[in-house]
Curated annotation (Swiss-Prot):
GO terms for molecular function: ATP binding; hydroxyethylthiazole kinase activity; magnesium ion binding. Keywords: ATP-binding, Kinase, Magnesium, Metal-binding, Nucleotide-binding, Thiamine biosynthesis, Transferase. Catalyzes the phosphorylation of the hydroxyl group of 4-methyl-5-beta-hydroxyethylthiazole (THZ). It comes from Clostridium botulinum (strain Okra / Type B1). This is Hydroxyethylthiazole kinase 1. Coiled coil: none annotated. Pfam families: HK. Substrate binds at M42, G191. It catalyses: 5-(2-hydroxyethyl)-4-methylthiazole + ATP = 4-methyl-5-(2-phosphooxyethyl)-thiazole + ADP + H(+).
Length: 263
């Protein structure tokens, strides 16, 4: 396995992360990227994204509040990412409820590129063609067969797939990881999943083994959440403490404290 200094390598480069994301959590995504050591840019005008992706280190596309303008921008940005060798992270927020989002993902896969798909377990199982239980943008799934869903979807799109829930699962189609860190308080803060997608973009920007970089991003969020909850047990203060702990997170801490099973 590649050297696991994922966070160190990311912070040495201060990668520029181009985000086309939803209006609910855009500020949180920008702030957590800054705290993590990356440089966020929330550029989504369709006549600007092609050029901006060309100077970016990674592209993060979040489909949470997808407008037609964002759809056009996301497709154009993915084409630029393919042409300029920029990794792309997709967060298929709410795809079981709004089927148009699946069409957008398939279009991006067809004309652009996808390196990582990060969703909750319900979204990932839905995209993999498996039965899943969701409510709006939330997963009600218990996680059964989640790693199998990740593996199937990773093979379909030839990318890394991460499914988050009580346990988190990551697969590249052959290898996998199961992460057992975290706190339930992460489910009480709007946008924790969106912020995680942004972290996945940051860690993959300058790290070749994207299974490891994605696992590191999830560990960073989960362990920062655990530490935040030690000091802040209410949602508002927890959200602030989460971003503070992301600022302080390190490779040594995530791999020492992390409860990861490699498959």
């Amino acid at each position: 396995m590649e050297n696991k200094n994922v966070i160190q390598k990311m912070r040495e480069k201060t990668p520029l992360i181009h985000c086309i994301t939803n209006y609910v959590t855009i500020n949180d995504c920008a702030n957590i990227l800054l705290s993590f050591g990356a440089s966020p840019a929330m550029c989504e005008a369709y006549d600007e994204v092609y050029d901006f992706v060309s100077i970016s280190s990674a592209l993060y596309i979040n489909l949470g509040t997808l407008t037609k303008e964002q759809e056009t921008a996301a497709v154009l940005a993915s084409i630029s990412a393919k042409n300029h060798n920029v990794p792309v992270v997709i967060d298929p927020v709410g795809c079981p409820a709004i089927k148009r989002k699946v069409e957008v993902i398939n279009r991006i896969a067809e004309v652009g590129r996808i390196d990582i798909i990060k969703g909750n377990i319900g979204e990932i199982k839905f995209l993999a063609g498996m039965d899943s239980e969701t409510r709006g943008v939330d997963s009600l799934d218990n996680g059964e067969n989640a790693l199998d869903a990740c593996t199937q979807l990773a093979k379909k799109y030839n990318c890394i797939v991460a499914a988050t829930g009580q346990k988190d699962f990551v697969s590249d189609g052959k290898r996998g990881s199961v992460i057992k860190n975290g706190t339930e308080m992460l489910t009480k803060v709007t946008g924790a999943g969106c912020m995680l997608g942004a972290l996945c973009a940051a860690t993959c920007a300058n790290f070749e083994d994207k299974l490891v970089s994605t696992t590191a991003a999830i560990l960073s969020m989960n362990i920062a959440g655990e530490k935040a909850y030690e000091k802040a047990q209410l949602p508002g203060s927890f959200r602030i403490a989460l971003i503070d702990n992301i600022y302080m997170i390190s490779d040594e801490e995530i791999w020492e404290r992390g409860n990861v099973e490699w498959k």
